Each structure stands twice: as structure tokens, then as C-alpha cells.
Swiss-Prot record:
Pfam families: Ras (PF00071). InterPro entries: P-loop_NTPase, Small_GTP-bd, Small_GTPase. GO terms for biological process: exocytosis. This is Ras-related protein RabV. Residues 144-180 have a biased composition (Low complexity).
């Protein structure tokens, strides 16, 4: 991915109001923290330059107004978005409870899974005020694949169950996807894990994107070979 255009990665920060979206944007791009809450009006964005494995990437980080749920999922808003950081406040249980609604709506706008979604718990510095435990997060969004393996065994043993499970899987595809989210805890105030968050999600994005990029190159080479063969004839 040496092409400069390919090295621009659009990241969208989403979540309920006052979960720390603007604080994360400011900390990531300016290495600053503002303790006074200033709600975002419309859209705010900035850039962050990162170098990973000798390659420079320009992160275009967007902070979108939280209460305008409909426009967030507009195709124009999500256009070219590669990564979504879905934030909730560790000291606010309702912000965590809203995550599933965000994911359900995102699933409708991201049917091809072209956008990678990461779950981020904010304000980890406020330990005494924490309302969301790691166990809550793990049980709801980052379960392992043991259940999937058990379901596969049951499907092999019973065709009827297989059909039923397929229907359930179609109806609950969101839950299956949501149970495999990558999760991070950060503090924009203390600058804890912020750099690690962005390094990790870019690494993960590149890992997922590389096979697609290589496949595009292969397809282009195949077309080139076909064209050359035609001229040779």
C-alpha cells in the first residue's frame, strides 16, 4: 500500500453524547485534553499521521454529532469509512446499553462488512465510578467461539436442528458479529492506551485489508496477461 491515496484511512468515532468522542479526537490529534464538555455541532474531524512498519498513514478521524442517528448512517457520511470506533462511557451504564442499538443500525449500513468496528470503553481513569464491568463487556460483545463450535456439532447430528439454527443465525446475525468485537479501554484525560488503540486498529485493519489488496493486484495481472495474449495472437 505505497500509493499515497491508499494510505489515507477514514475513521469514524461514534457513540452517545458525553462518552468522550471529542476528547479522544483532540487527544489523538493534538495530544491535549479539555475538561470542559463542549458538544459537537454537526461534524468535526482532524488528521493524525502514524508510521507503521516503515509506512506512513494519514488517519482522517471524524467525530459525528451523537443525537443525529439517522444522518450518521447516511451513505455519504459513511462513504470511504474503513474503521468505526464505537465508544461508551465506563461510568455510564446507559451508554453501554445503547451499544447494541448502534450495532444493529451499523449492521444495516455495513452489510458487506467493509467497515471494521471496534468497541472502546472510555474514562478508565474514573475507577471508583465504574458502572460497567469487564465481565459485562465480555459476556455481551467479546465471547469466544466455543458456542459456535458446539452449534456446528449439533448441526451435524441433527438436520432439523440445522435448519432451525440457520433460521436463528439469520435472525440473530447481529449478535453473532457483535460477540467478536475487538475491545479497548482508554482514558483521554490520562492519555492511557490512546496511542495503543490507534496503532492496534490500524494494524488490524491492514491485516484484514491486505488479502483484498493482493487479490485486486492478482486480478489486474490476470487482465493484463489476457490483454497481452490477445496482442500476441
Amino acid at each position: 500500500m505505497s500509493n499515497k491515496k491508499n494510505n489515507i484511512i477514514k475513521i469514524m468515532i461514534l457513540g452517545e453524547k458525553e462518552v468522550g468522542k471529542s476528547s479522544l479526537l483532540i487527544r489523538a490529534t493534538k495530544d491535549e485534553f479539555n475538561s470542559q464538555y463542549i458538544p459537537t455541532i454537526g461534524i468535526d474531524f482532524d488528521y493524525k499521521i502514524m508510521e507503521i512498519k516503515g509506512e506512513k498513514y494519514k488517519l482522517q478521524i471524524w467525530d459525528y454529532v451523537s443525537h443525529d442517528h439517522i444522518n450518521v448512517f447516511n451513505k455519504q457520511v459513511l462513504s470511504n469509512t474503513k474503521i468505526i470506533l464505537l465508544l461508551f462511557d465506563l461510568t455510564n451504564k446507559s451508554s453501554f446499553d445503547s451499544i447494541n442499538n448502534w450495532l444493529l443500525k451499523l449492521d444495516q449500513s455495513n452489510k458487506d462488512n467493509s467497515i471494521q468496528i471496534f468497541l472502546v470503553g472510555t474514562k478508565s481513569d474514573l475507577i471508583s465510578n465504574r458502572q460497567v464491568s469487564l465481565l459485562d463487556i465480555q459476556s455481551k460483545f467479546i465471547q469466544n467461539n466455543n458456542n459456535n463450535n458446539n452449534n456446528n456439532n449439533n448441526n451435524n447430528n441433527n438436520n432439523n436442528n440445522n435448519n432451525n439454527n440457520n433460521n436463528n443465525n439469520n435472525n440473530n446475525s447481529n449478535n453473532n458479529n457483535n460477540n467478536n468485537l475487538q475491545y479497548f479501554e482508554i482514558s483521554s484525560k490520562d492519555n492511557n492506551n490512546v496511542e495503543f488503540l490507534f496503532t492496534s486498529v490500524i494494524d488490524y485493519y491492514l491485516l484484514k485489508a491486505q488479502p483484498k489488496f493482493e487479490e485486486e493486484i492478482k486480478n489486474k495481472k490476470k487482465k493484463l496477461k489476457i490483454t497481452v495474449s490477445w496482442f500476441d495472437i
